[in-house]
Amino acid sequence: MTPPRDHEGGRARRGPNARRRPEPARAKRERGTPRERATEAASLHLTDDVVRELRATARPGKGDILVKVFSESAGAFAEGDYGTAIRLGEQSKHMALRAATVRELLGLAYYRADRWQEAARELSAFRRISGSTEQNPVLADCYRAMEKPDRAVELCDEIDGRSVAPAVFYEGQIVAAGALADSGRMDEAIARLERLELRPEVAEQHHLRAWYVLGDLLERRGRFTQAREWFEAVAGADAELTDAPERVERLRSGR
């Protein structure tokens, strides 16, 4: 099914005591991935650029051990062993405090371990050192979990859609919409997503995520027909991706 036509113009939290809403299209802990690390140095699983950055920022005499320890941290992260990734990432940080890549991976490991304050600290350092907003959606989500929705929206507003991948920009808008909903600004949250390009010729994962979140917000706002149409669009694109088919049936039956 194609996305629904335009209609007239729903609070998700991720903190420890959150009343969780279904996540759109992929689990929350899959939000935020390190930049590409495939490499010619296959045994290290690091790009040549990353290796150069590590050696350039390492404390004197620590370049080789830093590359080894950080490589192991990245490997643990890839395997979902976030405790080990954090332990090795902290060791890496002490050897190269100004390495943006180290702070980025460590922040993402803390994020996936639901350790919001530590994640925000490290991802803020990554943002400051690198000048990149690539991880702002994840950083903003940390502030949502810490019940600071206004700061979350500010971080999402920093993301320039012309300078990041579309998926990053859309993710920022999704997080911002959730933060607005956290503050009870449901109509603003809906309007934020409705301003996106939601009717592409070919729908990518980030489009489906935006459709799902918009459907969720509309349902929570009591706009059930429009919500059902967006869930139908998600289900039509990939019936296995989310619980959209079940939500369609529930809305059809009025449950």
Which sequence ranges carry the predicted segments?
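Alpha-helical segment of the N-proximal tetratricopeptide repeat
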Residues: 57-94, 98-105, 111
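Generic helix N-cap/helix-start motif at coil->alpha-helix transitions
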Residues: 29-32, 61-69, 95-103, 130-138, ...
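TPR/TPR-like (Sel1-like) alpha-helical repeat modules
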Residues: 129-133, 161-162, 191-198, 219-242, ...
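TPR-repeat structural position
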Residues: 82-83, 116, 149, 186, ...
